[in-house]
C-alpha cells in the first residue's frame, strides 16, 4: 500500500524451507525462491529472496527449467493497483477510502501451463472451509499433479507455527498426514517424491 503498510499473511515460509532442506540432503539440485520472511536458511545452497509475487514469478521463470516444482509459498492473490509514494494519512484520504486491487501472477498455473512444464508439479492449498472440495478444485483448475492441503483456523496455528497436518491429494489418491512438525511433513513429502520417480 505504501512504504509502511502491505497486504500479507502469517505464513512463515518454514514448510517450503524444510522441503528444500530435505531434498538437498537427498542430493537434489535445489533452488529455494522465498518471500519476505524472517527465517534462518543456513545450509541451503541456492536461495533467491524476493519481496513480491511479481518478483517471485520472475525468479521462477529465470530459475527454470526444472524437473520438479513445489509451490509451497502462500502468495497473495491480489496486490494494490498503485503503491502510494508516501504514507497514507487519515487526514488526506477522506471518507470512504477504497483500495483498488489487481490480480497477482498465478505462479502455480503458469508453471503448469509452460511449454517446459516440470515432470512433477506440487501445489499447496491453505483453506478455512471445505478443505477437500476446494483443494480438489485447485488441483483440477491449476493443472498440477499433487495438492498438499491444510485447513487454517485460529486454533490450528498451522500458518506461522512449527507444526502442520495435511492431506496429499493426487488425481487418484489421497493421503492424510497426522499432525507433526513441518520437518516431519517435509520428509514425508520428499519420500513420496522419491517413490514417484523411482517406483
Language model segments and positions:
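Short, glycine/charged-enriched secondary-structure capping and boundary segments
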Residues: 4-8, 45-48, 83-87, 136-138, ...
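Residue-level signal for pocket-adjacent positions within structured domains
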Residues: 1-2, 34, 42, 73, ...
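Glycine-rich phosphate-binding loop
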Residues: 51-125, 129-152, 156
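Gly/Ser/Thr-rich active-site loops/lids in small-molecule metabolic enzymes
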Residues: 8-26, 88-107, 143-149, 179, ...
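Glycine-rich phosphate/diphosphate-binding loops and the adjacent beta-loop-alpha structural elements
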Residues: 1-14, 42, 74, 117-138, ...
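Generic structural "secondary-structure junction" signal
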Residues: 3-9, 41, 77-80, 90, ...
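Glycine-rich phosphate/diphosphate-binding loop of Rossmann-like nucleotide-binding domains
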Residues: 1-52
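Glycine-rich phosphate/adenylate-binding loop
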Residues: 116, 130-199
Amino acid at each position: 500500500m505504501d512504504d509502511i503498510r502491505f497486504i500479507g499473511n502469517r505464513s512463515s515460509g518454514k514448510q517450503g524451507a524444510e522441503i528444500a532442506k530435505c531434498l538437498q540432503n537427498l542430493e537434489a539440485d535445489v533452488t529455494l525462491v522465498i518471500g519476505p520472511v524472517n527465517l534462518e536458511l543456513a545450509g541451503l545452497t541456492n536461495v533467491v529472496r524476493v519481496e513480491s509475487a511479481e518478483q517471485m514469478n520472475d525468479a521462477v521463470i529465470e530459475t527454470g527449467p526444472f524437473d520438479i516444482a513445489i509451490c509451497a509459498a502462500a502468495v497473495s492473490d491480489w496486490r494494490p493497483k498503485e503503491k502510494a509514494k508516501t504514507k497514507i494519512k487519515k487526514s488526506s484520504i477522506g471518507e470512504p477510502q477504497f483500495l483498488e486491487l489487481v490480480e497477482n501472477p498465478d505462479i502455480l498455473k503458469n508453471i503448469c501451463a509452460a511449454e517446459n512444464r516440470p515432470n512433477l508439479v506440487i501445489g499447496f492449498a491453505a483453506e478455512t472451509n471445505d478443505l477437500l472440495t476446494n483443494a480438489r478444485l485447485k488441483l483440477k483448475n491449476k493443472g498440477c499433479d499433487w495438492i498438499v492441503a491444510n485447513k487454517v483456523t485460529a486454533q490450528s496455528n498451522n500458518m506461522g507455527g512449527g507444526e502442520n497436518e495435511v492431506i496429499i491429494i493426487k488425481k487418484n489418491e489421497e493421503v492424510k498426514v497426522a499432525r507433526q512438525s513441518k520437518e516431519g511433513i517435509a520428509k514425508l513429502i520428499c519420500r513420496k517424491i522419491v517413490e514417484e520417480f523411482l517406483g
